Curated annotation (Swiss-Prot):
Record's protein name: Glucosamine-6-phosphate deaminase
Name of the coding gene: nagB
Pfam families: Glucosamine_iso
Class of enzymatic activity (EC top level): hydrolase
Pathway this chain belongs to: Amino-sugar metabolism; N-acetylneuraminate degradation; D-fructose 6-phosphate from N-acetylneuraminate: step 5/5
Family annotation (Gene3D superfamilies): 3.40.50.1360
EC identifiers of the protein: 3.5.99.6
Alphabetical list of PROSITE patterns matching this protein: GLC_GALNAC_ISOMERASE
Length: 243
């Protein structure tokens, strides 16, 4: 595991955007694993600028999102479909629609949807670069503490801490979905390369646990120590004192 401590969120986001850009530029059939949330917004901003500036052909690129809330329409302002459209796919409208993959949180059979998405990952993968955030409780994707490390794409019951953390995006906490469809830990580890980002003082404890604890399901991110190609980008506020 390689730790990259940069001065600011903006600088770290730019570095990660450059890594995604290079993957697309050098490998036109790149398969990218994408994440959502405030941590990722600047990454996509810089990536879009690089794609526009260089007029990059992305028609063969495939994207696979980590997760989606259960119960939200794709058009809902807080769905991850809407997020991805706003920050990437509408900003650089050259990605092919059927190459964009996001779980369907409105499926009538969520278990079948999880299986469908998992089969898609197996058929179309492996993912070249998977980007990840980390929750304050050490979750990756929506794989909460206690998640089986052998889990593949599955339906997740969100913890109260995750619901509270995500409530800032909703009018009030009761509007936050209680479930999500998420890639499992085993699914994430199939990626050839993983880049995790963590910014701000609220992520400092999670990064400290990631770096200092043994591999444990109590801190899902610790499983990344078993992967041969992981980079962790942190800003000064998220960097633990040991760095």
């Amino acid at each position: 595991m390689k730790i990259i401590n940069l001065d600011s969120k903006n600088l770290a986001s730019f570095y990660v955007a450059c890594e995604l850009f290079k993957q697309i530029q050098q490998h036109p059939h790149a398969k990218l694993g994408l994440a959502t949330g405030g941590t990722m917004t600047d990454v996509y901003h810089y990536l879009v600028n690089l794609l526009i500036k260089n007029k990059v052909d992305v028609s063969q690129v495939e994207t696979f999102n980590l997760d989606e809330y259960v119960g939200l329409k794709a058009s809902h302002q807080q769905s991850y479909h809407t997020y991805m459209n706003k920050v990437l796919f509408e900003q650089y409208p050259h990605f092919v629609k059927n190459h964009i993959h996001i779980p369907d949180g409105l499926s009538e059979n969520l278990e079948a949807e999880a299986e469908r998405y998992n089969n898609l990952l197996d058929e179309r993968g492996p993912i070249d670069i998977q980007i990840l955030g980390i929750g304050e409780n050490g979750h990756i994707g929506f794989n909460e503490p206690g998640t089986d490390f052998n889990s593949e794409t599955h339906v997740v019951n969100l913890t109260e801490s995750t619901i509270k953390a995500n409530s800032r995006f909703f009018d009030n906490e009761k509007d936050v979905p209680r479930q999500a469809v998420s890639m499992g830990v085993k699914s994430i580890l199939k990626a050839k390369r993983i880049i995790l980002l963590a910014f701000g003082p609220k992520k400092k404890e999670a990064i400290s646990k990631l770096l200092n604890e043994q591999v444990t399901e109590d801190v899902p991110a610790t499983i990344l120590h078993t992967h041969p190609n992981v980079e962790v980008y942190v800003d000064d506020e998220a960097a633990p004192d040991c760095l």
